[in-house]
């Protein structure tokens, strides 16, 4: 909250000046290295496995990238938070990437395949919520060089809703633990 009013943190000004709604240098270097120092060494020494979900714009598939050194692999983190239409594509790990929510919004199946079987799923929407189809004309135009990504964005609502159906089933069966708001939230996507 300390920096949320700083235009470098997130603003349309940053989008127009840098091509990213969240200014890369400020958010991924100045903030964690100087203003609010992140303990990179503690992260590096931790034995906890840490993954970020990204969308490969060339294949239209989700990628789950491990991060073992946050300072050296910060572009993986940046890619996972680079929202389409308001962020530049991030080139890292030999791929062109954007936010993972475009291709796998709730990656419970991906982590089950990795062997994780005690999932805690944190949702930002109330029980019963389902995503409606969205217009993707602008996405088609902006990402016309990446047809597989456009197809993935088009499929996103139905894939997301199917995943929610499975989560509710697994929750009833006691296979996963879900944390979600009890009522619809009245905040916007960027708040």
Each predicted region: which residue ranges?
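Patatin-like phospholipase
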Residues: 1-191
């Amino acid at each position: 909250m300390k920096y949320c009013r700083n235009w470098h943190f997130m603003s349309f000004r940053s989008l127009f000046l840098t091509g990213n709604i969240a200014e890369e240098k400020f958010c991924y270097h100045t903030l964690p290295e100087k203003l609010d120092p992140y303990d990179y060494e503690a992260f590096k020494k931790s034995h906890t496995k840490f993954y970020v979900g990204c969308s490969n714009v060339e294949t239209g598939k989700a990628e789950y990238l491990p991060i073992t050194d946050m300072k050296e692999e910060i572009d993986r983190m940046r890619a996972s938070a680079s929202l389409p239409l308001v962020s530049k594509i991030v080139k890292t790990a030999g791929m062109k990437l954007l936010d993972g929510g475009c291709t796998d919004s709730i990656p419970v199946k991906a982590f089950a395949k990795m062997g994780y079987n005690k999932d805690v799923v944190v949702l930002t929407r109330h029980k019963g919520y389902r995503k409606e189809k969205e217009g993707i004309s602008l996405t088609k135009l902006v990402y016309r060089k990446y047809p597989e990504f456009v197809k993935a964005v088009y499929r996103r609502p139905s894939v997301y809703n199917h995943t929610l159906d499975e989560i509710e089933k697994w929750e009833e069966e006691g296979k996963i633990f879900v944390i979600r708001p009890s009522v619809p939230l009245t905040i916007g996507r960027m708040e």
